[in-house]
Amino acid sequence: MNNVLSTNIAGKEMKVEFGKIGMLSNAATFMSYGDTVILTNVNASSEPRVGIDFFPLSVEYEERLYAVGKIPGGFIKREGRPSEKAILNGRAVDRTLRPLFPKGYRNDVQVVCTVVSVEKDNLPEILAINAASMALCLSSIPFAMPVAAVQVGLIDNNFIVNPNATEREESTLHLTVCATKERVMMIEAGGNEIPEDIMIAAIKFGFDECQNIINFQEEAVKKFGKEKDIPTLFTVDEEVEKDIKEFASDMIKEAMYITDKDERNAAIDAVNQKVKEEFGEKYEDKFGDIKEVLYNMQKKVVRHMLLKDKRRPDGRAFDQVRPLGCEVGLLPRTHGTGLFTRGLTQVMTVATLGAVGDIQILDGIDEAQSKRYMHHYNFPGYSVGEVKPLRGPGRREIGHGALAERALEPLIPSEEEFPYTIRLVSEVLSSNGSTSQASVCGSTLALLDAGVPLKRPAAGIAMGLITSEDLSEEQVLTDIQGIEDFFGDMDFKVAGTTEGITSIQVDTKLKGFSFNVVENAIRDARKARMTILEKINECISSPREDVSLYAPKTETIQIDPDKIRSVIGAGGKVINKIIQDTGVKIDIKEDGSVFVSSSDHEGVKEAIKIIEGLTKDVKAGEIYLGKVTKITTFGAFVEILPNKEGLVHISKLDKERVNKVEDVVSVGDEILVKVTEIDSQGRINLSRKDVLLDQENKENKEEK
């Protein structure tokens, strides 16, 4: 049976179909918004997974190129690994859904969102969050409540819900708000230095717009939703819990109140070892329960410390930033480096400048086709003092890199202002919370050190939240460290400049957070950001006047677009010859902009000279210094500009009669010639005789 329900959201139809497709999935839906369609399938294992201490949720966001009428490139002509954008979209869906499953739920759950049709005016990533929530609500899988997502744009101080492609180009804000009926669940934002008050208002606007989609989901559940399963939830053995608490409660409290991180961790390890020695034999098959009890005891102590004792694990005030350190110019051969330290968190970012042609080409369903500014983030095991295999970037690393990239993107100069491709790599050297925002600070240092004329320096900070069990008490924390992140309820990352916010990313372990938290976190983040920006300014107050000696020197010239073929030549013969002879990189745009790059400045000058010669028009009456390239019985061919030759007839070689061309010139000679005529076929006639006569007349006038 096919169940169909539709509603109007921001002037467009949102529709869900349930029961027609994917009959063997727990729930499968087609959900559309305009002509963008997401196929969502959700399934769960019948029994909990044994021996784990986490909820095994898997969210997959699958892009199909047929959705935009494309055939994949490459030899095999099929989709390969998910793109970075697909990974980021999958993470956004995951972060929105995860807190809404029951605590202690250990069944494997998989949510697969497949993008099957895309209309550029309606973003599939926004629809995917709504589609995933709808499918879970309609399924029998335990899921607390509907959650909705909208995108908010800002044009001329007016908020726009789910802006179309044209509006997204004009908008200075790109905000995604996910919310339940009562609380905000997740926030993603990028903006052109948006003032705090406007950002808060935009989030409230997005929350209100989410309510229509939540009502739509609730209506669908009433009409054709499945009855929910009663799950088997993980609970700790009561006897284990009682014994461990009686034995270790005082020791845990004493250890957690140690302010030094290393000493605290050592004390906790000692408690764990004592517990193992005391109860290892008695509860040899209950190590999972013991681990859970110890975790809950530590969490309770930290939360009591923050909410009741009003003190933080390291002794700081709630709005205090850890000690800061900034340094630039660490590495001798790189184009720019920045070392940023905040407490025990330390990130080194390296900037590399490349030619315009070094841009990243994107092959996917996204509107963007290329990127000239990119940020990569590496988080090795040694950053937390652990031994781990070094593999490629995981989802978390891709997500943190994209977040830092988004924070600086509005501040990067245009290609016209700064004709370089820019790559940043952040190496996390030490991690004790908020490495993504430390990467923003390190990136600012590296870009300024590299001579990139940023609009303004940027900095980032991570805010946290601790709440009581009944949510009656809330405490926002500035610059959270690892222990506060681990045992806390929220990670609220804010980056920006002195003028406003450039990026936000928020996720929570709760079933949402209040607007009071949003306002306090954003306003406290600004205070912290100003402190960090002052420290950055003390280290380096403006971009270097020149790029590094080891960076490519790029110069731009403008040529007539009709002359581009003259520079490229048949099959690229001419441009490849220039590149080979001068050692430069040449990139040509359709509008006639030519970018010439090389670490050898002389090579750049030589290449530009050749290109200007190739595109310069030969004019009758002008005098050129040319090189003899060929001799015949009737004259000499002379190259006056690159790839442009003319004929000096034997009668035009000298003032006197010439019997043999070789008597006057030889191949390779440089001579001054005058253009006497360009005939209808474009052939150039030259005269050395006219130049000599002009010189003679000039000398005679000077003698008089």
UniProtKB/Swiss-Prot annotation:
KH domain location: 552-611
Cofactor(s) annotated in UniProt: Mg(2+)
SUPFAM superfamilies in alphabetical order: Eukaryotic type KH-domain (KH-domain type I) (SSF54791), Nucleic acid-binding proteins (SSF50249), Polynucleotide phosphorylase/guanosine pentaphosphate synthase (PNPase/GPSI), domain 3 (SSF46915), Ribonuclease PH domain 2-like (SSF55666), Ribosomal protein S5 domain 2-like (SSF54211)
UniProt KW Manganese keyword: no
BP term (GO), one: mRNA catabolic process
Family in the record: Belongs to the polyribonucleotide nucleotidyltransferase family.
UniProt name for this protein: Polyribonucleotide nucleotidyltransferase
Originating organism: Clostridium botulinum (strain Alaska E43 / Type E3)
